[in-house]
Amino acid sequence: MSDQRPRDENDYDGDGFDGADVNEHLVEGESPRDGYATFGIQGESFGHANEEMDLDEYVAEHVIGDGSAGPGAETGDAADPTERALTTGIVGDNIVSKKAQRSGDPRAAAREAEEAAALRLRAREIEDEILARTPENNPEPSLERVRRAMELLGDPQTSFPMIHLTGTNGKTSTTRIVERLVRERGLKTGRFTSPHLHDFRERISLDGEPVDVERLVRVWDDIEPFIAMVDHESTSNGGVRMTYFEVIVVLAYAVFADAPVDVAIVEVGLGGAWDATNVADGVVSVVTPLALDHQRLLGDTVEDIAHEKKGIIKPGAFAVVAAQVPEVDEILREQCLEVDATMLREGDAYAVTAREAAVGGQMISVKGLAGEYDDLFLPLFGAHQAHNAATAIAAVEAFLGGGETKIDDGVLRAALDAVTSPGRLEVVRRSPTVLVDAAHNPAGAQALREALADSFQFNRLVGLVAVLADKDAEELLLALEPTLDHVVVTRNTSPRSMDPRELGQLAAELYGDDRVTVVDSLPDALDRAAALADDEGVGGGVLATGSVVTAADVRMLLGVTSS
């Protein structure tokens, strides 16, 4: 059985995950809801992507629900949606305000229901408007459009200090740990990560929660005319409209300024120098481990990738650099010298001094910039997460006290204890245990394999693997081969997903025909993997991996959509 602290299967929070893929499931004009609808999953964020409906229909379907269960069942489930809102006080997953209920005016609840419905419908329209733009897996290598939008908006990105993170693997977990630490310190935080699992609002969070619909709609309505102006200027000069990712970045920085936040913790989307997030200057720049990924866009060697990533290190900043291969380390060192940034290297300025697997995570000790931190509980699995935590601690020390002041012990322990990283070696079901992990490149798969060996014990572990066609599927499968007793290959909801037959052929060459099963549909593949895991009785498990999309798909299939 897995060495994992039992917890409520429905209690999953947080909104991010590791991996450098940036909303890899999207093509131009496509909503993530389109893909999930093919699985027959009709959640409020995914089903009926292109249907038109009036407000009453939307209230009935998305805000109030079908009346088949819940508090309304006890009151007769009025057929009229408004009446159901009045009698139950529940509007879908939104509780009508207690003030409205206490007032004795049932119409107030109905008005709130309609207002909530209108806001949610408008938010969905906004998402679809943004999705119609060039997708983020095909970025335009320029900062001109984002800079122009920022200028027109009064440069909101200058209204808050920023901790900026780049890397190949580990940057989302590190971003989440940094955010939790500074929030526990009492600062109001804005966090930007990508891609999202289930709702694009996950990308933009305030104090750890996705931006609320009311603020999203209001800020979008404020900035949309300026985005249209930039589009017009660019296309009039033979350029392109702002891309999906560029617009999301502008929206995020505007939301952070509107809040306002005390600090923004921002993960790059892709690369560094020409990533849209780089219109803001980080007072602390963090570089997590670099490896080969997105070679089409970033280059075929780690040196090429390092030259792109180093662009987030700005003059006078602190550069917190996780352990790198020597070639990468030298490139980053030269950048720090060139811009007069202070380089704080893992192994020199900070380090993991001890770690031991524990129930529900691990115990770690860290040498920080300002002192030692011993016997910290981290509820994440694997040595790579211990190093991510150490990097996050160093980044926060640099931000709060220039690396000269220790983080308060109570603050540190409370923050780490509350850290989550959905989609990263996450337990989403029991009997059999189902894990999801967003590993999508060989380095990520190797870290996953080591974390499994370190933290879990299965009598039989079955892989459920779906990867994108432009990824190094062979090396990913090879990295996992010693860990998996059997592998079920399939496709995920991305139109870029590799054909299962092609993936199965690769797997058979590495694993042997008797250890490989090909299933075309992911829901059927999940059922098959679970059955294979149960073949030898208790102690079996399923590992769903190969892509951010695969992790999100399996979470959705198993009803884990909280983010």
Give residue spans per PLM region.
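Short functional linear segments
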Residues: 1-167, 174-185, 192, 232-239
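Beta-strand->loop->alpha-helix junctions that form or flank phosphate-binding loops
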Residues: 192-195, 322-323, 337-357, 377-383, ...
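Glycine-rich phosphate-binding loop signature in dinucleotide/nucleotide-binding domains
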Residues: 256-262, 455-459, 529-541
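C-terminal helical cap/extension that packs against the catalytic core
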Residues: 325-335, 340, 360-363, 433-435, ...
